[in-house]
């Protein structure tokens, strides 16, 4: 009889950008007291957001909800230039929790625009990161593509002055297909200096592919509005096995595991390890008692906090190396 085993993906859970964003809100609360206003959910995870709300964070979408002189934090997903300008005009104390890898894309957009390139954004319409990146330029200046099919519909000013950037949390495989379609239609399109999909997204997708090869079912811990968590579930499902995404252990269904000997568990980049442990406890209680860690890429990158929120010893260069 096959042993009932749970295999944990590595890496999984929090990435450096999420760690930094949560720390910025927590440090701001410690330094300046509640309330601290946060534009949009600082990361897309219900547990994290609820926990910060209990500590005094107030999550808003419209800066009109923020009183004069208040402290405001931008979410990890980044904001448009219009939001930055409005915050400056209103005189808020601002801390920017935008992931540095998203900021890198913003800088790439500015550089390309200065060179008079028309820019195509590969991403999901309505996602806050996409809105922030496209908002680095005036409305209508960037073109959005979500699928390979969208590439054929593009109308560009000059195919020889064209470039693309990507949302950082996309499926690596799907994005490759879109990039291939762009290069086929526009042979002179400029590629980013460095891949836009972040290291954490890539590493977690690679790990879940390996997990899917070993397991009968994969559980992804993540909130429904988390782009990278959704992509993990899709990647696992594309391997032909059952794959489910759950916000926490309460969403697990015992019937999913009937007849399944090997269960894979991973977590999106915004999902804390405490939720993974609760999921493990529930599945173990249903008979999958053996747990082992999978092998995968080691991650050592740490992004430093804004200087106003740093503590002694947090300015060393080795704290932000890969």
UniProtKB/Swiss-Prot annotation:
- Known cofactor(s): [4Fe-4S] cluster
Keywords, comma-separated and alphabetical: 4Fe-4S, Iron, Iron-sulfur, Isoprene biosynthesis, Metal-binding, Oxidoreductase
Q: What is its EC number?
A: 1.17.7.4
* A Gene Ontology molecular function term of the record: 4 iron, 4 sulfur cluster binding
Q: Which domain of life is it from?
A: Bacteria
Binding positions for [4Fe-4S] cluster?
Answer: 15, 99, 198
Q: What is this protein called?
A: 4-hydroxy-3-methylbut-2-enyl diphosphate reductase
């Amino acid at each position: 009889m096959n042993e009932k085993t749970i295999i944990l993906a590595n890496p999984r859970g929090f990435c450096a950008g999420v760690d930094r964003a949560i720390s910025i809100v927590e440090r701001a609360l410690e330094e300046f007291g509640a309330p601290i206003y946060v534009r949009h959910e600082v990361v897309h995870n219900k547990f994290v957001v609820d926990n910060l709300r209990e500590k005094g964070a107030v999550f808003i979408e419209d800066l009109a909800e923020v009183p004069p002189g208040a402290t405001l934090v931008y979410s990890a997903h980044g904001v448009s230039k219009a939001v930055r300008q409005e915050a400056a005009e209103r005189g808020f104390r601002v801390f920017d929790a935008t992931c540095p890898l998203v900021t890198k894309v913003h800088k790439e957009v500015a550089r390309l625009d200065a060179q008079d390139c028309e820019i195509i954004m590969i991403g999901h319409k309505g996602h806050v990161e996409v809105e922030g990146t496209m908002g680095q330029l005036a409305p209508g200046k960037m073109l959005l593509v979500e699928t390979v099919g969208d590439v054929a519909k593009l109308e560009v000013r000059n195919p020889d002055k064209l470039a693309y950037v990507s949302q950082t949390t996309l499926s690596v495989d799907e994005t490759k297909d879109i990039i291939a379609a762009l290069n086929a239609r526009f042979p002179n399109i400029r590629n980013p200096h460095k891949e836009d999909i972040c290291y954490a997204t890539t590493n977690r997708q690679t790990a879940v592919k390996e997990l899917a090869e070993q397991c009968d079912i994969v559980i992804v811990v993540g909130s429904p509005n988390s782009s990278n968590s959704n992509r993990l579930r899709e990647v696992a499902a594309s391997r032909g096995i059952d794959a489910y995404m759950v916000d926490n252990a309460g969403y697990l269904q015992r019937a999913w595991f009937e007849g399944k000997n090997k269960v894979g568990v991973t977590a999106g980049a915004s999902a804390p390890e405490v939720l993974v442990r609760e999921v493990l406890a529930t599945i173990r209680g249903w008979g999958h008692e053996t747990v082992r860690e999978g092998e995968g890429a080691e991650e050592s990158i740490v992004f430093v906090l804004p200087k106003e929120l740093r503590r002694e010893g947090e300015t060393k260069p080795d704290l932000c190396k890969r």
